[in-house]
Amino acid sequence: MAKKGNRIQVILECTEHKASGVAGTSRYITTKNKKNTPDRLEIKKFNPVLKRVTVHKEIK
């Protein structure tokens, strides 16, 4: 059997969207190497609902 890889799929969710009170949510799916980055990802991505770049954090 082949062993499991180090690269896993993670979901990033906007942190500023909940506080704004606007309906909907902004989520992105990406991959990360769990050996190189064991902690949660925090990336600035575009939020199409708020129409600006916001911080997206990994959820699980």
UniProtKB/Swiss-Prot annotation:
Q: Which InterPro entries match?
A: Ribosomal_bL33, Ribosomal_bL33_sf, Ribosomal_zn-bd
Q: May I have one GO cellular component term?
A: cytoplasm
Alphabetically list the UniProt keywords: Ribonucleoprotein, Ribosomal protein
Is Ribosomal protein one of the keywords UniProt gives this record? yes
Which superkingdom is the protein from? Bacteria
From the record, what ranges are coiled-coil?
Answer: none
> Could you tell me the Gene Ontology terms of the biological process aspect for this record?
translation
A Gene Ontology molecular function term of the record: structural constituent of ribosome
Looking up NCBIfam families in the UniProt record yields: PRK00504.1, PRK00595.1, rpmG_bact
What's this protein's family per the entry?
Answer: Belongs to the bacterial ribosomal protein bL33 family.
- HAMAP family per record: Ribosomal_bL33
Q: What is this protein called in UniProt?
A: Large ribosomal subunit protein bL33
Question: From what organism does this protein derive?
Answer: Flavobacterium psychrophilum (strain ATCC 49511 / DSM 21280 / CIP 103535 / JIP02/86)
